Amino acid sequence: MLEELLNGNIEKKTITQIYGPPGVGKTNICILSMLNAIENGKSVVYIDTEGSLSIERIKQLSGKNCEELLKNIIIYEPSTFEEQSEALEKIFLLENIGLIIIDGIVSLYRLELCDNINENTKLNRMLGKQISNLLKVARKKNSGILITNQVKDSANGIEPAGGRLLEYWSKSIIKLEKAESVRKLTLEKHRHAKEGENLRFRILQNGLEIINKSY
């Protein structure tokens, strides 16, 4: 799916960010990107911060017995932002990693924000360190990075959560929207592909159906 929009695979050694509201289909796209990496002979790290990853959905989208597929997926399910940091540290020890996915990059971060300035400063530093470690491990392993992000209200409607830090370090940013049964991916930022391109699709039980691609 993302390959269609980006005119190629997810770029190595950089961050690709997909943002959109809950239930719009971000995890489905993560699973398809994961399956594509596995088909290319690589393993995938999947950090699931929101409990969105479903083994049954992997089976539906792969159309195969997923026992063999699961051998190539390293899944982490952190319940705190500190555990998310620890999961990223563990990736340095893994081999043959083609793609690192964090489904809900700031979900746990936002849960732990509070009225204490010192605690929030600590969280911001931890987020910065996580982004740094992500890029270090991706460059070391020659891996792609795919993150999903929540949205927040802004003067222009909605925008990605996580502030300018995630916006700056994400070399590709893709907005995912939903109108009834149709979803739309829009490429908002990219170093090589044409910004503004969009792809409309439907989510089916056994996959995603592309409706059209426009510019």
Swiss-Prot record:
Top-level division of the source organism's lineage: Archaea
GO MF term (any one): damaged DNA binding
GO terms of biological process kind: DNA recombination; DNA repair
One Pfam short name: Rad51
Transmembrane annotation, as ranges: none
InterPro entries listed in its UniProt record: AAA+_ATPase (IPR003593), DNA_recomb/repair_Rad51_C (IPR013632), DNA_repair_and_recomb_RadB (IPR011939), P-loop_NTPase (IPR027417), RecA_ATP-bd (IPR020588)
PROSITE patterns: RECA_2
Keywords assigned: ATP-binding, DNA damage, DNA recombination, DNA-binding, Nucleotide-binding
Family membership noted in the UniProt record: Belongs to the eukaryotic RecA-like protein family. RadB subfamily.
Function: Involved in DNA repair and in homologous recombination. May regulate the cleavage reactions of the branch-structured DNA. Has a very weak ATPase activity that is not stimulated by DNA. Binds DNA but does not promote DNA strands exchange.
UniProt-listed HAMAP family: RadB (MF_00350)
Xref: PANTHER family: DNA REPAIR AND RECOMBINATION PROTEIN RADB (PTHR22942:SF47), RECA/RAD51/RADA DNA STRAND-PAIRING FAMILY MEMBER (PTHR22942)
Protein name: DNA repair and recombination protein RadB
Organism (species): Methanococcus maripaludis (strain C7 / ATCC BAA-1331)
